Design a protein with these regions (language model features):
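Concave beta-strand-loop units of leucine-rich repeat
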Residues: 1-9, 17-30, 38-51, 57-73, ...
Length: 112
C-alpha cells in the first residue's frame, strides 16, 4: 500500500515496484493520495488541481483518463473503476458516470 497523502510535495514514486513506476502530475506541483495504488495503480487523485491531464509513465488506463461526456472534462480518478460497471463521480458536473466495456466511455446518470 502506497499512501503519500502525508507528504503534499511528493511528485513521484521512484524506487517503487515496477507496476507503480514513476508518476508526475504536470498540471500542479504535487501528486498526492495514492491510497490503494500498488496492485494495478488505478486510484489517482491530484488534490491540488483535481485535473489529471498528464501522468508521465502511468499505466495506459490512467493516461487515457476518464472523460465525462456530460461536462466535457476529465473526472477525478479517485475511486476510479476497478471493474466494468463501477460508478464514478465527475467532479466537473457532479454527475455519476459508468464505464462501458472499453473503460473510457461512460453512460451519464444525473442524480437530479
Amino acid at each position: 500500500m502506497f499512501d503519500c497523502s502525508g507528504c503534499p510535495k511528493l511528485q513521484n514514486l521512484e524506487g517503487a515496484p515496477e507496476e507503480v513506476g514513476f508518476f508526475d502530475c504536470n498540471s500542479c506541483p504535487g501528486l498526492r493520495n495514492l491510497e490503494g495504488a500498488p496492485e494495478k495503480v488505478i486510484n489517482f487523485d491530484c488534490n491540488n488541481c483535481y485535473n489529471l491531464k498528464s501522468l508521465k509513465g502511468a499505466p495506459k488506463e490512467v493516461r487515457d483518463g476518464f472523460f465525462c461526456y456530460s461536462c466535457k472534462k476529465l473526472t477525478s480518478l479517485e475511486g476510479a473503476p476497478r471493474k466494468i460497471g463501477d460508478w464514478v463521480e465527475c467532479w466537473g458536473c457532479d454527475n455519476l458516470i459508468i464505464t462501458d466495456k472499453d473503460r473510457r466511455k461512460y453512460k451519464i446518470h444525473d442524480r437530479d
